[in-house]
Amino acid sequence: MGISHSIVVALRSVLKQCGLKIATKTLEGFVREIDRVAPWYACSGSLTVASWDKLKGDLVREQQKGKLKAGIIPLWKLVKSCLTDEDCQQMVEAGQKVLDEIQESLSEVERGEKVKVERKQSALKNLGLSTGLEPEEKRYKGKNALGEIRKRDEKGEKKGDRAGEAHKERSLYPPLVEFKQLTLSNSEPDEGVSTSEETDSEEEAVRYKGERYQQDKMATQPRKRQKAADESQLAAWPPDCRLQGPSAPPLYVQR
């Protein structure tokens, strides 16, 4: 507990120099998480950009597994910003001295335990990278590993195909709700022609016929008057002056 408390004091001093105030409990949880994820840091870590970036790699891998506590990465970024700030270099150096003293005070037993944990984690990490197997696939590793994995993949593909076909069938047709919206209830008016619209159409047809009749009547009246005037004028002429049609040719006399 004394070692962790000393690291917490060093980090809090560095953050305070940059104007950042972090609660002691938060920093204690941060240090415990670092000690769990990267036990090498307590033995050989330092308050340098290179060592802090190396620590980030272990934190990110733990985060990808879903085992890293919330708030660790943001707090790591705050410390990283202080390490690169020239105004905080004096406090960074002071914190580094504290870290050096902690590392020197570690007993051979504590140092050996941390190194042992680090080697175990490194071996597990390298095993996963070399085999290329996921944690679930490692459980199947053995005599029938390939057969078990193949059966599992085939089952997954069949389930995926059935789910895909079901989704395809559902997507081909719209939901029934849309069809219900298309039906007409008894309370809704029919979209056909209403009675008032039919009456208006009939009246419009009668009016149109009346206008056409008046136009035709007005057009024929002048012709009738002209014809009657011509007939009366012809009747007033003497018979000799009336127009005669062409006379018939004289009869042919045989000599």
Swiss-Prot record:
Recite the other comments. Intracisternal A-particle Gag-related polyprotein: Intracisternal A particles (IAPs) are defective retroviral elements. Due to extensive mutations in the envelope coding sequence, IAPs can only form defective viral particles confined to the intracisternae of the Golgi. IAPs are an important class of transposable elements that induce genomic mutations and cell transformation by disrupting gene expression. Readthrough of the terminator UAA occurs between the codons for Met-218 and Ala-219.
Specify the species. Mouse intracisternal a-particle MIAE (IAP-MIAE)
Is Zinc there in the keyword field?
A: no
GO MF annotations in UniProt:
structural molecule activity
The protein's UniProt keywords, in alphabetical order, are: Transposable element
Question: Quick check: keyword tRNA-binding in the entry?
Answer: no
Composition-biased stretches (Basic and acidic residues): 148-171, 204-215
Q: Where is this region: Disordered?
A: 135-255
Protein name according to UniProt: Intracisternal A-particle Gag-related polyprotein
According to the record, the segments passing through the membrane are none
Record's Gene3D superfamilies? Retroviral GAG p10 protein
